[in-house]
């Protein structure tokens, strides 16, 4: 995907699980794809991670839920196609795309910027935003590893 912009919105980890962890968007021509890395619930009520992809091509708004969960659990799949206000009829579909929990949260190759700023070629701001994104991902990775260690030590 030819990506022109990647906007990162970081939420404090103390606000989990009520808010999204982070989200960003990519633009490819007239099609926009919004990625939201969030917490969701499995069918048994346990918390799990999910990536929601929302694509907008001007006519329809397609939403995918990509879940990572405990293989013993049955996740809730919420995937749908929602018509835009200009379209009166929309098709409905249900799809689920499981991902491996070891997949790292990365942004597609892009010029990283903070919260949809005006398009510029300011390398300093771009580098700072890319550094902030890397620090957030490192923090999330460390936090997840710590949670796993706590879970293992509690079960022993």
From Swiss-Prot:
UniProt function note: May be required for viral persistance in the host.
Protein name, UniProt field: Protein L*
